[in-house]
Each structure stands twice: as structure tokens, then as C-alpha cells.
């Protein structure tokens, strides 16, 4: 895997838990790249990042969210992505930033402020991937796993929720 987010401790721990069956059948995974870049826009060489968002539409940085999600769903290891629907909002903050910096009115800004992509796999599982670098949302990669028997979430706090299991009273010491 070339995506660095698959190597974070929480992602690796959750992947191991999923592979061990702790969450039961994994049904849905979420991931994203949400990062308010307002303070960083001037730092990008030749304004490359804003320029790319102005000229291209869609989730232009899907790998942070998709890498860990694909690992948990066993994409290309028994399952594959089959159906994809992606939508974005209108562009508000990108054109406003350019106008503030240059005085230039931008009418053809391509990428919306928020892009959401929903993917269904061959085996009937779903994945939601989001991209948002234009609004004041706090940083998040939204990593979430929804299983038949458990749940994991990394942002805004790391948490696990597992279905309680029935324990035979003879196995529990008093």
C-alpha cells in the first residue's frame, strides 16, 4: 500500500480486529480528507492546490479515506468496487478566496466545497468517502467501521463499540 494513512496505529489495530471477526461482518466503512486549508493556501508553490481545485471536479484526494476503507473491505482480495455515485456542493469558498486574494471574479470554479462519494461493492458492502478542504470543519479522516457486531470510529475521538456477548454463568467466577 502506498497510502500512508493505512499505517496509523488506529487503522492497523481496527484492521486486525476486523480480520479477527471482532466487528462481525463488516457492512460499511467511511473515510475522508477533511482539512480547512484556509491558512495554508498561500504556502502552496505557484498556488498549485487552489488551481487544481479550480480546474478539476470530484474527490481530488481520495486516498487518505479510501486506503484504510479498502483494506477493511478486502477490496481486490475477495471483493471489488462495483457502483459509485459522487456528488459535490456548489463552489462557494474557493471563488471567494480567489476574489479576496486577487480581486478577480471566478465564475467557472469546478470543485464544490464538499464532495461525497458512495460506493457499493460486489459483495453488498458500502463505503462513503468525503473530501472537503474549503470549509471551516475541523480536521478529520472520518475513519469508521460499521459491522454487524461492532463499530469503530477514529474522529473526533477514538472509540469502539461492541455488541455484548452472552456469557454462560458457569464460566463467570463469583
Question: Language-model segments: what does each one mean?
Answer:
Residues 1-2, 154:
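Hydrophobic residues in well-ordered beta-strands that form the structural core
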Residues 3-108:
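Predominantly a Rossmann-like dinucleotide-binding segment in NAD(P)-dependent oxidoreductases
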Residues 23, 120-123:
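A short, structured loop/turn motif at beta-sheet edges
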Residues 26, 81, 114, 139-140:
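A structure-centric signal for secondary-structure junctions around beta-strands
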Residues 49, 57, 77-80, 120, ...:
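Arginine residue identity/basic-tract feature
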Amino acid at each position: 500500500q502506498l497510502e500512508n494513512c493505512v499505517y496509523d496505529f488506529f487503522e492497523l489495530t481496527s484492521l486486525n480486529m476486523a480480520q479477527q471477526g471482532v466487528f462481525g461482518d463488516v457492512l460499511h466503512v467511511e473515510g475522508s480528507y477533511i482539512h480547512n486549508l484556509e491558512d495554508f493556501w498561500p504556502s502552496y508553490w505557484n498556488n498549485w492546490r487552489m488551481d487544481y481545485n479550480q480546474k478539476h471536479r470530484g474527490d481530488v484526494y481520495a486516498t487518505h479515506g479510501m486506503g484504510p476503507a479498502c483494506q477493511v473491505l478486502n477490496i481486490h482480495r475477495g471483493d471489488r468496487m462495483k457502483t459509485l455515485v459522487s456528488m459535490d456542493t456548489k463552489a462557494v469558498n474557493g471563488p471567494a478566496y480567489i476574489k479576496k486574494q486577487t480581486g478577480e471574479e471566478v465564475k467557472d470554479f469546478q470543485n464544490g466545497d464538499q464532495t461525497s462519494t458512495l460506493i457499493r461493492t460486489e459483495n453488498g458492502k458500502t463505503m462513503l468517502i468525503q473530501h472537503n478542504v474549503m470549509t471551516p470543519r475541523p480536521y478529520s479522516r472520518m475513519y469508521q467501521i460499521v459491522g454487524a457486531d461492532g463499530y469503530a470510529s477514529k474522529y473526533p475521538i477514538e472509540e469502539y463499540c461492541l455488541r455484548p456477548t452472552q456469557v454462560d454463568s458457569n464460566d463467570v467466577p463469583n
